């Protein structure tokens, strides 16, 4: 019997020993190999804190600060570390309701129970100061410092852009970003996101049982410093930009001003505009909804995204192409026979007079010679050939494609080609008589205002342009984009552009010109008026450059739905921009007062109430 019980006792000992060995092995595995449990254990005593870099600043061309940063704080939470929380006291301390607390905690749990996420974002320095002395009582919560964008002057919202929280697409496509990070959403903030954002750092802090940080882990040897973003030095003239927005304050339209010799954008505004600080901080979402629902579309960048018929300003490019192709000469004249509608004026005896008087029949016949060059007996094939040649030269002027300016969302406009009309009418079913409206900048031709300002640059430079751009350089090494310094030639002779410049000078200063309201004493302004047809009231259009020789500025102005042509509204507004830039001040105070205060599109509502859809 004793042997029997001894045998059983041995078996029991073996079983207990085996269980003990398995327990030790499992414990060792948990300690040494199981990453999840190791990470959980580490988080009980260590806190990984992301160090957010300061975003790069922005300056105007004269060194004036446009965008800077202000310190704010995010309240972070690690859900599984929240223990013994007096929820009522916590909610009173941070100023939220119990329901809000539960919703935020549920969101944090969904993201990760073991990782930090934002519980409350963009806390002011004042609120942080009030919470600092009680925060240690809330285990699992801590403060993370970051910066908030501040726009020094309430200008250039469409250029500077705004910053917002990353979305799911950002998280999926770029591993740099984590939930709660911020990214440039529009304007230069978006175009230069990688340069502006900097590089995040990391700090590991030891935390005691009372949720107090007691010092850096391993004396900070595992920490990495955040690297601040690079500063942008823009081409904008802040004073000119502010003035342009002042002049267009009660209007719809846009202004683009460029330095012809460099392609640097001096001012770019879209009206109505808004204060970029509206899209900063915790009120951003509410303000965005309000701006987005405004019937006047203040978020829409008309300077880059509106596609208008150019109207008569397009005649300058038409004349240059026709002269280069040899289908007309500088002395070619056409009778103003009203074959296409025109205002009352004498017949143009040459190209210079045609530009000055903006004669529609003149450019009708000029365009016909470009399209029907007699290369083929078949009129349809001949028109296809002529349109192909015309289209090629128009693209050399920067029309019909997205100009590579350093802002997102640029539209390309439309310069119709043979494929366009073949699709619309069918092959060999169209000819010049189908498309003649293109001759005066109507029909199927569409341009964006940036392209029209660039046309003014081309004439100012007598045949070439540099890509319009908004950043001169960035970073401590003054990094420049080499593409912005490439000269783009039209391939058209300088002597023809001299004719265009003289004709545009006569538009403003000559007898019978259409833009006498753009005349500035002692400044030679060269301009071209236009009236862009529209379903409602037509748009008032004007392009110009000044001075005539050694130009300093080229400008395009669109005033939407204005009751009058280009010479009535857009031309005098352009003259104010030119005078402000060249002189530094506007001396024609009566002109300034009138065109700043006047509203040419009074019948248009600026806002509307969004109606709720009816239930069916």
Model-derived segments and spans:
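Periplasmic/cell-envelope proteins involved in peptidoglycan metabolism and beta-lactam response
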Residues: 1-285, 307, 329, 386-396, ...
């Amino acid at each position: 019997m004793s042997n029997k019980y001894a045998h059983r006792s041995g078996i029991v000992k073996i079983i207990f020993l085996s269980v003990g060995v398995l327990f030790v092995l499992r414990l060792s595995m948990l300690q040494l190999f199981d990453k999840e449990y190791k990470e959980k254990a580490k988080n009980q005593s260590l806190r990984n804190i992301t160090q957010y870099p300061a975003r790069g600043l922005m300056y105007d061309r004269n060194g004036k600060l446009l965008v800077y940063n202000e310190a704010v704080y995010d309240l972070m939470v690690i859900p599984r570390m929240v223990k013994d929380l007096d929820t009522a006291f916590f909610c009173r301390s941070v100023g939220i309701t119990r329901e809000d607390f539960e919703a935020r905690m549920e969101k944090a749990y969904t993201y990760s129970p073991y990782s930090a996420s934002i519980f409350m974002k963009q806390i002011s320095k004042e609120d942080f100061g009030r919470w600092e002395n009680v925060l240690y009582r809330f285990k699992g919560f801590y403060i993370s410092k970051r910066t908030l964008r501040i726009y020094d002057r309430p200008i250039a919202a469409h250029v500077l852009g705004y910053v917002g929280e990353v979305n799911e697409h950002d998280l999926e496509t770029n591993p740099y970003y984590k939930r709660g990070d911020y990214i440039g959403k529009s304007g230069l903030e978006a175009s230069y996101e990688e340069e502006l954002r900097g590089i995040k750092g990391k700090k590991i802090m030891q935390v005691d049982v009372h949720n107090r940080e007691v010092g850096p882990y391993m004396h900070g040897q595992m920490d990495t410093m955040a690297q601040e973003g690079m500063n942008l030095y823009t081409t904008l003239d802040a004073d000119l930009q502010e003035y342009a927005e002042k002049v267009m304050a009660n209007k719809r339209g846009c202004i683009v001003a460029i330095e012809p010799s460099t392609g640097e954008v001096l001012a770019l505004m879209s009206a109505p505009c808004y204060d970029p600080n509206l899209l900063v901080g915790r009120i951003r979402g509410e303000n965005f909804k309000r701006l987005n629902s405004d019937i006047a579309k203040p978020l829409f960048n008309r300077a880059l995204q509106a596609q208008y018929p150019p109207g008569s300003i397009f005649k300058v490019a038409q004349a240059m192409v026709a002269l280069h192709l040899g289908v007309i000469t500088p002395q070619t004249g056409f009778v103003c026979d009203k074959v296409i509608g025109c205002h009352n004026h004498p017949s143009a005896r040459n190209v210079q007079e045609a530009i000055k008087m903006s004669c529609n029949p003149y450019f009708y016949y000029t365009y016909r010679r470009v399209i029907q060059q007699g290369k083929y007996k078949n009129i349809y094939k001949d028109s296809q050939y002529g349109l192909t040649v015309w289209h090629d030269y128009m693209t050399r002027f920067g029309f019909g494609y997205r100009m590579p300016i350093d802002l997102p969302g640029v539209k390309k406009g439309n310069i119709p080609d043979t494929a366009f009309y073949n699709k619309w009418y069918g092959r060999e079913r169209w000819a010049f008589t189908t498309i003649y409206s293109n001759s005066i900048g109507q029909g199927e031709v569409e341009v964006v205002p940036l392209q029209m300002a660039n046309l003014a640059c081309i004439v100012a430079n007598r045949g070439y342009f540099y890509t319009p751009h908004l950043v001169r350089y960035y970073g401590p090494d003054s990094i420049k984009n080499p593409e912005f310094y490439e000269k783009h030639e039209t391939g058209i002779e300088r002597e023809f552009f001299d004719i265009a410049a003289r004709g545009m000078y006569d538009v403003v200063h000559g007898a019978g010109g259409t833009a006498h309201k753009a005349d500035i004493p002692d400044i030679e302004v060269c301009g071209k008026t236009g009236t862009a047809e529209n379903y409602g009231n037509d748009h008032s259009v004007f392009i110009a450059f000044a001075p005539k020789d050694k130009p300093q500025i080229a400008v395009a102005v669109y005033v939407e739905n204005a009751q009058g042509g280009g010479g009535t509204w857009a031309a005098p507004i352009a003259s104010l921009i030119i005078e402000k830039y060249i002189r530094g001040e506007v001396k024609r105070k009566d002109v300034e007062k009138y065109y700043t205060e006047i509203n040419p599109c009074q019948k248009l509502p600026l806002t509307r109430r969004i109606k709720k859809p009816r239930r069916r």
